[in-house]
């Protein structure tokens, strides 16, 4: 940030709406950026768009690169561990982003309360998530907003 100020530049952050809503920002990374270009875009939409762009480049190098990005678990780690595996997977800690993004949308857009969120989630995701997981994730997102 000091360097950006010295040369009249900006520190661009890559954090998205999902991370900001959950308070899951990297300190002195996304958290300290001067301009967050993705802050109004949920993580599930980012992934969808990357997948869409990838589909436009079938059989080309860009498709392989973008699919590798999609296949890599979401993680704040910038480098792999010694055995080339990512140890800290964000969704193992905060839960599925597709649920959080669903909750954020329905809470902000429609003002849904926990009971209604639960019912809509059961309808939207059918049997993908069990009752306890949904309740746990609804509680998690509500605590993030308190």
Labelled PLM ranges:
Residues 1-146:
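ATP/NTP-dependent adenylation/nucleotidyl-transfer catalytic domains that generate, transfer
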